[in-house]
Amino acid sequence: MRKKKNVLIRKIIAENRKARFNFELLEHLEAGIVLNGTEVKSLRSNHANIAESYASFENEELWLVNAHIPEYTQANRFNHEPRRLRKLLVSKREIGRFFNAVSREGMTIVPLKLYFNERGCVKLEIALARGKKIHDKRETEKKRDWGREKARLLRRYG
């Protein structure tokens, strides 16, 4: 009998699409996140919002601020606070590199995706980002529109 192949599936829970439009993303990093049991159960039912969240430094540790994971409805009195600070698990070397960029160059750390990896652990993809100005956003929009128009013309006229 043949064995079934293990299919690597990355189940995305929440995605921050605004970050790609509002920021210039420079460096990506995968971080673990410290969660309670009820938070994991809430995430398994695909309830989370990281659109207005960011990461900040406190006591040489990286923390996720303002991420919303709603309360798990079946857990009554042992529930978690939806917008609490959550510790991110990143190596000291990477924390140092990100800390230098944030403190010296005025960058920010933005979460991009919250997902379950192949082993079933919750991971957060974060990026070192620099804010875009209004004219940069318009330029990005023009490039995207021209790319769509070009693809449409190629399909139509071959």
UniProtKB/Swiss-Prot annotation:
**What SUPFAM superfamilies is this protein classified in?**
Small protein B (SmpB)
Kindly list the GO molecular function terms attached to this UniProt entry.
RNA binding
Q: Which domain of life is it from?
A: Bacteria
Q: Tell me the Pfam families matching this sequence.
A: SmpB (PF01668)
Supply the alphabetized keyword list.
Answer: Cytoplasm, RNA-binding
UniProt record, GO biological process = trans-translation
Q: Which InterPro entries match?
A: SmpB, SsrA-bd_prot, SsrA-bd_prot_CS
Q: Where in the cell is it found?
A: Cytoplasm
Task: State a GO cellular component annotated for this protein.
Answer: cytosol
Stated family: Belongs to the SmpB family.
- Annotated function: Required for rescue of stalled ribosomes mediated by trans-translation. Binds to transfer-messenger RNA (tmRNA), required for stable association of tmRNA with ribosomes. tmRNA and SmpB together mimic tRNA shape, replacing the anticodon stem-loop with SmpB. tmRNA is encoded by the ssrA gene; the 2 termini fold to resemble tRNA(Ala) and it encodes a 'tag peptide', a short internal open reading frame. During trans-translation Ala-aminoacylated tmRNA acts like a tRNA, entering the A-site of stalled ribosomes, displacing the stalled mRNA.
Protein name from the UniProt record: SsrA-binding protein
Q: What's the source species for this entry?
A: Bartonella bacilliformis (strain ATCC 35685 / KC583 / Herrer 020/F12,63)
**What gene is this protein a product of?**
smpB
